[in-house]
Regions:
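A short, Lys/Arg-enriched amphipathic alpha-helix followed by its capping loop at the start of a domain
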Residues: 2-4, 16-23, 208-211
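C-terminal alpha-helical cap/extension of soluble enzyme domains
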Residues: 59-62, 66, 75, 83, ...
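Structural motif
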Residues: 20, 49, 82-83, 136-137, ...
Length: 219
């Protein structure tokens, strides 16, 4: 069955996503930086506001460089202590390749938690070579658009990547409703939206009706 994952910034977003029928949340802060690690307080508020699974972003700066690994490990530990059981992460090295060492170092702090490797894959030198690396790192999901330019440009790559699962392919990054039938036909079962369920932009909350419209598209 297809799933819809919705980006949430706070409890209000989480409640609207659940009411609209979403299946999972990606919890982040600071979308101006493309999504950073949320505070412990925000995580607790969201966890208390919804029954949906919550994947929490582990990233401390815009882009796909590792940043402060010690800080990220501390944040991961603190989030786990607060009850987080699912995460989102993934890094590139200075040469544009998947940073296996840093990723595995942080994953070690998760101790078996489910996690998504996020769109660093799209920004790597070769998405197919990178997929082969990422699938050895222990994630159960890869968030990708197939291209750094977004889903519209990456449709061909996505159709090839979904055939190489596992891990599961979660499509997001400029995803629009008109992409859904073609992706479903190719075997994609995971869809990820953010601004698409915020008609008034990132400064406004998730709209329940928009989430419901997306969920209905997946049926």
């Amino acid at each position: 069955m297809p799933i819809l994952e919705v980006i949430a910034l706070n409890a209000k977003d989480a409640e609207a996503a659940q009411e609209g029928g979403a299946h999972r949340l990606e919890l982040v802060s600071d979308m101006a930086s493309d999504g950073l690690t949320p505070s412990i307080a925000t995580f607790k508020e969201v966890r208390n506001s919804t029954d949906l699974p919550i994947r929490v972003m582990l990233r401390d700066a815009k882009g796909f460089a590792p940043g402060n690994l010690k800080q990220l490990r501390r944040q991961a530990w603190e989030l786990r202590e607060a009850g987080a059981t699912e995460f989102v992460l993934g890094f590139l090295d200075a040469g544009g390749e998947i940073d296996e060492g840093v990723t595995l170092n942080l994953v070690a702090e998760l101790e078996g938690c489910a996690w998504t490797f996020h769109r660093a894959l799209d920004n790597s030198n070769d998405v197919f070579r990178s997929w082969g690396i990422v699938k050895t790192l222990g994630c159960d999901t890869v968030l990708a658009a197939g291209s750094p330019k977004g889903v519209e440009d990456g449709l061909g790559n996505l159709k090839e990547l979904v055939a190489q699962a596992p891990p599961a392919l979660l499509v997001g990054g400029g995803l629009q409703q008109h992409h859904v039938p073609e992706l479903l036909a190719a075997g994609v079962t995971g869809f990820h939206v953010g601004s698409a369920v915020r008609p008034a932009g990132w400064e406004s909350p998730v709209e329940m009706a928009s989430v419901r419209e997306w969920v209905n598209r997946l049926v």
